[in-house]
Amino acid sequence: MSYRSIILLVLSTLNLVYQQGLIPGVVVTPAPIDVPGLHVLIVEESGDRNTVDKGQLSVLQTTLVKQEVVASGGEYRMYDANEPPVEEPWRTAMERPRTSLPWLIVSNPGKGGFEGPVPAGDGAIDATLKIIGGLK
């Protein structure tokens, strides 16, 4: 078996493991935004930035997440929970249920989706990029 075949097998296995939700803390669901392509939405309460976890705050303040999404040909938005957008698909995405803030929605029909709290703690930016990277 060639190295290329082994690498493809490993990558396929990792993709399957990721999509089956076998990586702790990451559950891939059907894409929550029914529009082709990668879409990433962060919902926050901007008035609470001084009380959110430092890791979550780093995700809210960094440009790395947006740069990664845009470089992948996707669309990125961040909205305040009290400031609903008018344009689709963001308006519909903002209407989805959430249990806390800040909240992350990653969607790519055909590849799956993620909805959950913005990762917290040390490595929050890397964890966010990992979620997005698995759904590109």
What are these model-derived regions, one by one?
Residues 2-9:
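Sec-dependent signal peptide recognition
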Residues 3, 15, 105-106:
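Domain-start "cap" segments at the beginnings of catalytic or binding domains
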Residues 10-26:
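Bacterial Sec-dependent signal peptides at the C-terminal "C-region" and cleavage site
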Residues 19, 68-98:
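Surface-exposed substrate-engagement region within the catalytic domains
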Residues 21-75:
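Local sequence-structure signature of Cys/Sec-based thiol-disulfide redox active-site neighborhoods
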Residues 38, 87-108, 114-115:
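Structural micro-motif
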Residues 44-55, 84-85, 111-123:
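Short acidic, S/G/P-rich loop/turn micro-motifs used as interaction or catalytic elements
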Residues 106-136:
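Non-catalytic, surface beta->alpha helical segment in thiol-disulfide oxidoreductase systems
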